[in-house]
Each structure stands twice: as structure tokens, then as C-alpha cells.
A protein has these predicted regions:
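Primarily N-terminal secretory
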Residues: 1-5, 13, 37, 56, ...
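A short, Lys/Arg-rich alpha-helix, primarily the initiator
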Residues: 2-26, 76-96
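Short basic helix-loop element that most often maps to the first helix and adjoining turn
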Residues: 18-37, 62, 88-103, 132
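Conserved hydrophobic/aromatic packing and binding residues within compact polymer-binding modules
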Residues: 20, 34-35, 45-48, 74, ...
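Recognition helix of helix-turn-helix/homeodomain-like DNA-binding domains
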Residues: 39-54, 79, 110-125
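DNA major-groove recognition helix of helix-turn-helix/homeodomain DNA-binding modules
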Residues: 58-73, 127-140
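Helix-turn-helix/homeodomain-like alpha-helical modules used for DNA recognition
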Residues: 84-131, 135
């Protein structure tokens, strides 16, 4: 009887989707089973694993809990920003540039009222808005 070890070495993994697939398989879960636990469709699980689209922050947090792994393995730069906490990062970068909220937001093409909600923590930036901010302020 021959057994084949199907799991790649952890050192070979580099993306959140690869970690997701590795630990899903390690836990003996099918894409359908994991999808049901996350309340999403199996095709979405495959999309995350195959890097067709990024894992949203809330899904990454839930997924880490389900797979019993550190959230950081499933976080891309946007998720790291959101968990940092992003309110402190935004405030610090804005102050470093010596700008008020309105000027900081307008220089990135963002509504000042929306930006104020981000910095106060009453609203979270979308991935698209994060990328827009990062294009102007790379240190974010």
C-alpha cells in the first residue's frame, strides 16, 4: 500500500488563496463544505483560491476562524490596512503631510465627508477607495 502526501510545503505558499486551499484540504473540507460555513457559493471559494478575486476582509476573518489559522495568512495589503486599524493610519499619514481632512481627501479624489467618516471609524473604505488613496499616498 502506497500513500501519497498531497500537501505542498508551507514555504511554497505565498498568497492568501494558496493558504486558504492548503488549510481547507488539510482540514478535509470540500469547497462546498467551506462555502456553506461561510455562507457563500462554492464557485466563490474557488475564485479566492485561484486568485481570480481577493478575499474580502470580513470573509478572511471568518475563514481564519473556520480553518483555525492566523488571519494574517489570509490578508492581502487591503485587509492588513483595515485591521491595522485604518483610522490611525489615515490620521497619521494626513498629519505627516500637514493637511486637513478636506485637502487630504480632495487630493486623492475622495469626497471629504466620506473621508471624515473613514477617519472617525464610522465607515470603512472599500478596496477600490483604498487603492485610490494608496496611489496618491503610497505609505498608506
Amino acid at each position: 500500500m502506497h500513500l501519497r502526501f498531497i500537501f505542498e510545503a508551507l514555504s511554497d505558499l505565498s498568497t492568501p488563496g494558496e493558504y486558504m486551499r492548503y488549510y481547507r484540504q488539510l482540514r478535509g473540507l470540500t469547497t462546498r463544505q467551506l462555502a456553506e460555513k461561510l455562507n457563500i457559493v462554492p464557485a466563490t471559494v474557488l475564485g479566492y483560491e485561484q486568485r481570480r478575486f481577493p478575499i474580502p476582509y470580513d470573509i478572511a476573518v471568518l475563514l481564519a476562524k473556520e480553518l483555525q489559522i492566523p488571519e494574517s495568512l489570509l490578508f492581502d495589503d487591503f485587509c492588513i490596512f483595515i485591521s491595522a486599524p485604518y483610522t490611525e493610519i489615515l490620521h497619521t499619514v494626513r498629519k505627516r503631510h500637514g493637511l486637513n481632512q478636506g485637502d487630504f481627501a480632495e487630493s486623492a479624489g475622495i469626497s471629504p465627508s466620506i473621508y471624515a467618516k473613514w477617519e472617525s471609524g464610522s465607515r470603512r473604505p472599500s478596496r477600490k477607495m483604498y487603492q485610490q488613496l494608496k496611489a496618491i499616498y503610497p505609505e498608506i
